[in-house]
Amino acid sequence: MSERVEINPYGAKPSQLDHIVGVLVRGGLIAYPTDSGYALGWRANNRKARDRVIRLRGLDRHHHFSYCCRSLSDVGKLVRLQNADHRLIRQLTPGPYTFILPSKNNVSRNAKMDKVRTVGVRIPDHPLVQSLLKVLDEPLLSSSLILPDPEDRILDTEDLYDEVYGQIDLFVDAGYCPLEPTTLVDLTGEQPQILRRGRGVIDFL
């Protein structure tokens, strides 16, 4: 079974947030809203949830996932930041960007992108995500809720819930979310490189 809970993103009740966190702490997999569509979220040490995401989305086992963070302070605990990286991320977040950076040793192997030890991090501009991460008090591993069939671009939350029913533990329904990917920015080199154009503007280049 999969539970569905409807939440006002601008007025989530403490009991609702506690319930979501409880599902995560018990090893659950959730679907939740972000500023770039619905995403799947789980705790970084939860290998079983990661494997469920791979099956649900039909992904390669070497697929990389990103950390959903509450603040730049959380980002700094996961990746190595140069001064220029810090300034750019502070300028663009919260917002629809994912940044690729060298990971620190404490980053879960469930998230790392490659043997170079890089990882993706983002700070979504969504009130419910911010509230949830504050209560959870740790970043979430995250993956866009994209179904294996590229034609299944579902915007209605009831239809989306039906598609993932039985494959997740909790669907956090906060209504419509724009379905457009984050802008993917590689910060591992001397200059920022855009790996994917998405919802975030790139006039900072």
Residue ranges of predicted features:
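Active-site-adjacent structural elements in enzyme catalytic cores
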Residues: 1-205
